[in-house]
Amino acid sequence: MKAILALADGRVFTGKAFGARGEVTGEVVFNTSMTGYQEILTDPSYCGEIVTMTYPLIGNYGINPEDVESGRPHLSGFIVKEACPYPSNWRSTTTLDDYLKQNQIVGIQGIDTRALVRHIRDNGAQTGIISSIDLDPESLVEKARKAPSIVGRDLVKEVTCKEPYHWTEGPWDLSEGYQQQTGEPRYKVVAYDFGIKRNILRNLVAIGCDVTVVPATTPAQDVMAMNPDGVFLSNGPGDPEPIQYAQENIRQLLGKMPIFGICLGHQLLALALGGHTYKLKFGHRGGNQPVQRKAEGQVEITSQNHGFAVEGSSIDNTAVLTHINLNDNTIEGLEHCKLPAFSVQYHPEASPGPHDARYLFERFADLMEKNRQSQG
């Protein structure tokens, strides 16, 4: 069945429908990862986005019930050069096409993804539409232009949990799969769910944390009443500026206990400190972004997924910039000058991606231990 991708600037691509049939709008972005499409599909940070995979063949190892980062896909649509119809992997239980159909995700394949990615790179991420219903290019371009922008929207409320819950699952093991937490946890952590990935929670369990996940709107007073050793600020979708309630809660929690933020959590921490954020031209999405630790000069290859960044000069008086992106010199990490609070823009938990930065979870544990000892 024919399908069309149309961008708000008038560019049109014709291909074949796969996954669910229908019509969806979203910000068209690209991810440079060769693998990890299942984790990408289920990452809540992609809410409101139509994701293009730059690797030409996607779906060749199928879909399994374990490698998911949330309970369902959150992205608006999926674009690939070719979707593999016959996957081969010992863990696979279904095809990519069937998985998208089951979850009502509209996809398009067979377009020139190289041309699309170059267009986004040169002209910036923009609103687009995929349709297998309306096949009139002019009509679709007009719909794309009228679709809401991702800027200024609170997408966190669309992906956060409704009620608090306890997380006990640890990282995956080749012989045993995902293991439940054993032994007595060392630290009690409250994790704000702005769109949290499960592998972040697994890494918190791995360092000995008893993790309680709370909705994004949970008041700071309720968190403090839980008497945690630390607070974690999760990843999440879209523009951080409208998430005013989270910024205010973070301000109230600063100095009360150690705080660690990742991705959107990093941006929200910066905003809570009086900083500013801005929209990147086409964002960082992939598992091969080089980041330098400024103190040591050491380089990490990192997994990233964000379309906004922190303006470095806006937080000079309150925080130290700890990491920079070597591709474009954007801010990748910060640390409060006096209080036990730090964050990174990238994803140390990977999933998918490299594990160069998992030391950051241990650093969070060290801060909680020092804070506990200082309180006697």
Curated annotation (Swiss-Prot):
Enzyme class of the recorded protein, top EC level: ligase
One BP term from GO: 'de novo' UMP biosynthetic process
Span list, region CPSase: 1-184
Subunit: Composed of two chains; the small (or glutamine) chain promotes the hydrolysis of glutamine to ammonia, which is used by the large (or ammonia) chain to synthesize carbamoyl phosphate. Tetramer of heterodimers (alpha,beta)4.
Family of this protein: Belongs to the CarA family.
Enzyme Commission numbers on file: 6.3.5.5
Annotated keywords: Amino-acid biosynthesis, Arginine biosynthesis, ATP-binding, Glutamine amidotransferase, Ligase, Nucleotide-binding, Pyrimidine biosynthesis
Organism: Syntrophotalea carbinolica (strain DSM 2380 / NBRC 103641 / GraBd1)
One Gene Ontology term of the molecular function aspect: ATP binding
Lineage: Bacteria, Pseudomonadati, Thermodesulfobacteriota, Desulfuromonadia, Desulfuromonadales
Residues of the active site: 263, 347, 349
Residue ranges annotated for the Glutamine amidotransferase type-1 domain, each copy included: 188-374
Protein name: Carbamoyl phosphate synthase small chain
Pathway this chain belongs to: Amino-acid biosynthesis; L-arginine biosynthesis; carbamoyl phosphate from bicarbonate: step 1/1; Pyrimidine metabolism; UMP biosynthesis via de novo pathway; (S)-dihydroorotate from bicarbonate: step 1/3
Highest taxon above the source species: Bacteria
Pfam families given in the database record: CPSase_sm_chain, GATase
Chain positions recorded as L-glutamine binding sites: 45, 236, 238, 264, 267, 305, 307-308
Catalytic activity line of the entry: hydrogencarbonate + L-glutamine + 2 ATP + H2O = carbamoyl phosphate + L-glutamate + 2 ADP + phosphate + 2 H(+)
Keyword Amino-acid biosynthesis included in the entry's annotation: yes
Role played: Small subunit of the glutamine-dependent carbamoyl phosphate synthetase (CPSase). CPSase catalyzes the formation of carbamoyl phosphate from the ammonia moiety of glutamine, carbonate, and phosphate donated by ATP, constituting the first step of 2 biosynthetic pathways, one leading to arginine and/or urea and the other to pyrimidine nucleotides. The small subunit (glutamine amidotransferase) binds and cleaves glutamine to supply the large subunit with the substrate ammonia.
InterPro entries: Anth_synth/Amidotransfase, CarbamoylP_synth_ssu, CarbamoylP_synth_ssu_N, CarbP_synth_ssu_N_sf, Class_I_gatase-like, CPSase_GATase1, GATASE
